[in-house]
């Protein structure tokens, strides 16, 4: 399994990258322009994206999806996926770092970003404002310090505990279901501590401001692999109301990207790039058979 070399305590480097941007498309050489126009799906892109020469995509730190390395490079599943999609679309992606799910969603609505790849689940409410291409699934996991394993490595231990999670994320809604299970068992509900990003949730665990950090299963696997002697995690079960959530790349409705983006995903499913990326990052269990557009609202 491929893992990130960064650990939770290094994620604060995000702030210094907020102003980074890619080189303008106007500086591309004629050869590069010709290559872009020859990409299979370039003609399907909206004129605004062709003119910009780039797809601006919001992103926060959420290993293994996105990790800010010491030299400033952003690595992870998301950049690898973007590289494969760019081969089909003919334009690169530019990750613009931000914090907070609400800020990234509203940023798309105000045209600061063309897209956002979460990880964030699609819902009927979100599909009212955004087009969503589902490309993977997740189960919620709860990370704890391994030194507290005797105390916390038990599903019932989470009941009544302090759980840090990103405000508005899948973790928040999944914890509500977990709390229903806790109460059915005669146990106290967990307390949700809403924070801006994944980095903040892990730091809360490290500093004993929270007992657990709620996150995606792939992020929990990556964090434990990066520091196996420091972290453990629980996985929310079906009995505890987990189910499986569909994670999607979001685009504002009306920006013209939905159909070409779906076609790009279909292409990388067909040519094996999707399977390769999911396998390299050890998240085959979260793979889907095919990408879908707006599955929560399509008839």
Residue ranges, per PLM feature:
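Extended ligand-binding regions for polar small-molecule ligands
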Residues: 35-39, 79-88, 148-149, 156-157, ...
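Extracytoplasmic small-molecule ligand-binding "clamshell" domains
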Residues: 30-118, 271
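Ligand-binding clefts/hinges and TM-proximal coupling segments of bilobed small-molecule sensing domains
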Residues: 24, 34-44, 170-189, 232-233, ...
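Bilobed "Venus flytrap"/periplasmic-binding protein-like clamshell domains
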Residues: 62-63, 74-88, 120, 139-197, ...
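Acidic, polar ligand-binding/catalytic clefts
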Residues: 83, 92-157
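Bacterial lipoprotein signal-peptidase II cleavage site
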Residues: 20-30
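Periplasmic-binding protein-like
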Residues: 137-144, 225-266, 283-299
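A ligand-binding cleft/hinge motif common to bilobed small-molecule-binding domains
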Residues: 102, 119-127, 174-178, 207, ...
């Amino acid at each position: 399994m491929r893992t990130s070399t960064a650990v939770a305590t290094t994620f604060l480097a995000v702030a210094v990258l907020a102003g980074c941007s890619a080189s303008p498309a106007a500086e591309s050489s004629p050869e590069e322009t010709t290559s872009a126009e020859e990409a299979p799906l370039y003609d399907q892109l909206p004129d605004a994206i062709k003119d910009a020469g780039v797809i601006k995509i919001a992103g926060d730190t959420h290993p293994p999806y996105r990790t800010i390395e010491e030299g400033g490079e952003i690595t992870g599943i998301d950049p690898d996926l973007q590289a494969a999609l760019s081969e089909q679309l003919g334009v690169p992606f530019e990750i613009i770092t931000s914090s907070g799910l609400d800020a990234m969603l509203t940023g798309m609505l105000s045209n600061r970003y063309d897209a956002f790849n979460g990880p964030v689940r699609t819902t009927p409410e979100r599909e009212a404002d955004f087009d969503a291409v589902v490309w993977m699934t997740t189960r919620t996991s709860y990370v704890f310090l391994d030194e507290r394993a005797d105390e916390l490595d038990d599903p019932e231990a989470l009941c009544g505990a302090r759980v840090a999670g990103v405000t508005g994320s899948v973790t928040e809604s999944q914890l509500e279901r977990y709390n229903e299970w806790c109460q059915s068992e005669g146990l106290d509900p967990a307390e949700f501590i809403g924070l801006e990003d994944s980095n903040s949730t892990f730091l809360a665990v490290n500093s004993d401001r929270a007992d657990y950090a709620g996150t995606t299963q792939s992020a929990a696997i990556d964090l434990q692999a990066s520091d196996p002697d420091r972290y453990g995690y629980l996985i929310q079960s079906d009995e505890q109301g987990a189910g499986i959530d569909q994670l999607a790349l979001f685009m504002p409705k009306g920006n013209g990207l939905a159909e070409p983006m779906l076609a790009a995903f279909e292409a990388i499913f067909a040519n094996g790039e999707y399977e390769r990326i999911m396998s390299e990052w050890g998240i085959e269990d979260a793979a889907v058979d095919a990408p879908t557009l707006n599955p929560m609202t399509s008839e």
